[in-house]
Amino acid sequence: MQAQLMVYGYNFVSELLEEKIVEQMNQYIKMDLPESYQVSKREMYADMLNGKITSMERISLLNDLSQNFGTILYTGSDPGMVPAAKAGGIVDYCQEMPQVFFRSKINLNITLRSIQSGIPLRALDIMGAGGFLMSNYQPELARQFEEGKELALYGSREELLDKTAYYLSHEKERQEIAHRGFLKVQKLFSYEMRVRKMLELANLEF
């Protein structure tokens, strides 16, 4: 898990779960699954481990950030694991969350390690609300959005801290990036555009 924590953009947890390890885990994890269940135990165990890795990563990075910058943590989980951050509690997804994204100087997205492809919904939520997005590197994010122009991506703990310090001290540039990210989401990720894309992939006319 410590090795995976150091790598961004590629997940190797499942590859390292050899059959011997899966059998050992079977002795401690009991699951009564129907025969029709299509996901292998290797994949389920990989998801479990990736969930734990993500939790460790988020707590560690949020502690680093909150010890160096003013940080508000919106969560229903125990905020005591990030003691230097201010607890913001839970906000309503439709009414309050967009305002949080828009008013925050930097919004941090730390993608679940089990999400190996695709653009995280949270990233679109943030940019769609006009907020500045700082996200871990994801291949699809890097392809669809221009780093340093429409969002900010980091590939290490050090890069996250450096870019956070930079963008907090460059307000005009930060606001311009947030606006360009907002325009890109409006252009490419509206309901109409997504429906058009789905119909196109299904070879149907709009």
Where are these regions (language model features)?
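Nucleotide-sugar donor-binding catalytic core of glycosyltransferases
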Residues: M1-I115, Q138-L141
